[in-house]
């Protein structure tokens, strides 16, 4: 009995540290990109997955101590997939005292009617879902739309575009929507997926599976995700450094003539970003730049096992 109590205390200690880390990361992203302003009404897109649950809880937590006042409204799109547990989110949100709206649209039927059997449905489904969420944001008077993409999603998107799209394009923490009417924010932009996964498991959120539509998995994204997870295990700090690189772009040392005026370089031009080192190799640090191991990672890794043992 005493051993179980000690494990429970350790779990709570680790959970508190994890929550503080997520709060810190979300708060920093909000500050860096001016995501939330005085009087904002944030539409939090809630899918029933670990990311959106975590985003909602951290935003509610920050709301209590934020220097600006803002409101939150959770929105879920019920696309009428067979077997969708439509009672889960309303019950959870009412229990938490969160303002919410469930939007019911049979996009599943439209997609099944338009897309031949065996073909991936993700593209059409995504367009339909996006349009409905934009419309809902307008109806609710939302000034910002919050999505639950995290740091790993952003890096995956960067590599997907590099490997398959031939462009260096990631997923922005904040940007105007494609219809030009809404500001989309990603408060989890600085958060690690493994932190979110641990937090969601400890919180025991009522997770809704994401495979209800029966669509084919995005194999390209899966390959990229596996690659990044492998790197994270084999080369600690690499993921953090790659994300830092997205925040430290040097256009003069790339090849995009739209970003830098290569044609305008003449004798007497200013030396930019250290200039060209010619035959000298770039001075690369032995350890990933700016990376420091999280002191409590090993303890957090034990948290999942501890929770299982207590139960």
UniProtKB/Swiss-Prot annotation:
Its main location: cytoplasm. [4Fe-4S] cluster binds at residues 122, 125, 213. Keywords: 4Fe-4S, ATP-binding, Cytoplasm, Iron, Iron-sulfur, Magnesium, Metal-binding, Nucleotide-binding, RNA-binding, Transferase, tRNA processing, tRNA-binding. Disulfide bonds: none annotated. It is an enzyme of class 2 (transferase). Pathway: tRNA modification. InterPro entries: Rossmann-like_a/b/a_fold, TilS/TtcA_N, tRNA_Cyd_32_2_STrfase, tRNA_thiolation_TtcA_Ctu1. Its cofactor is Mg(2+); [4Fe-4S] cluster. It holds the Pfam family ATP_bind_3. It comes from the Bacteria. The thiolation reaction likely consists of two steps: a first activation step by ATP to form an adenylated intermediate of the target base of tRNA, and a second nucleophilic substitution step of the sulfur (S) atom supplied by the hydrosulfide attached to the Fe-S cluster. Catalyzes the ATP-dependent 2-thiolation of cytidine in position 32 of tRNA, to form 2-thiocytidine (s(2)C32). The sulfur atoms are provided by the cysteine/cysteine desulfurase (IscS) system. Homodimer. This is tRNA-cytidine(32) 2-sulfurtransferase. It comes from Enterobacter sp. (strain 638). The lineage of its organism: Bacteria, Pseudomonadati, Pseudomonadota, Gammaproteobacteria, Enterobacterales.
């Amino acid at each position: 009995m005493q051993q179980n109590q000690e494990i429970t205390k350790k779990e709570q200690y680790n959970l508190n540290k994890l929550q503080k880390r997520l709060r810190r990361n979300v708060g920093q992203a909000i500050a860096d990109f001016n995501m939330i302003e005085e009087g904002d009404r944030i539409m939090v897109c809630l899918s029933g997955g670990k990311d959106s649950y975590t985003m909602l809880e951290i935003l509610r937590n920050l709301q209590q101590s934020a220097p600006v006042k803002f409101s939150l409204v959770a929105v879920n799109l019920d696309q009428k997939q067979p077997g969708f547990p439509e009672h889960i989110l309303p019950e959870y949100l009412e229990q938490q005292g969160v303002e919410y709206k469930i939007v019911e649209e049979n996009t599943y039927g439209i997609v099944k009617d338009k897309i031949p059997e065996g073909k991936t449905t993700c593209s059409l489904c995504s367009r339909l879902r996006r349009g409905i969420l934009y419309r809902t944001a307008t109806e609710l008077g939302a000034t910002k739309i919050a999505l639950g993409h995290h740091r790993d999603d952003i890096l995956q998107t960067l590599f997907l575009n590099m490997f398959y799209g031939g462009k260096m394009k990631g997923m922005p923490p904040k940007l105007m929507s494609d219809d030009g009417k809404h500001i989309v924010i990603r408060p989890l932009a600085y958060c690690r997926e493994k932190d979110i996964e641990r937090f969601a498991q400890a919180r025991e959120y009522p997770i809704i599976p994401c495979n209800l539509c029966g669509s084919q998995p995005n194999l390209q994204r899966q390959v990229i995700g596996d690659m990044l997870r492998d790197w994270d295990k084999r080369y600690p700090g690499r993921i953090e450094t790659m994300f830092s690189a997205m925040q430290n772009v040097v256009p003069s040392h790339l090849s995009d003539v739209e970003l830098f005026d290569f044609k305008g370089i003449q004798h007497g031009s200013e030396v930019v970003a250290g200039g060209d080192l010619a035959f000298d190799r770039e001075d690369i640090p032995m350890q990933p730049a700016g990376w420091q191991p999280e002191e409590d990672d090993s303890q957090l890794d034990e948290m999942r096992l501890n929770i299982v043992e207590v139960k």
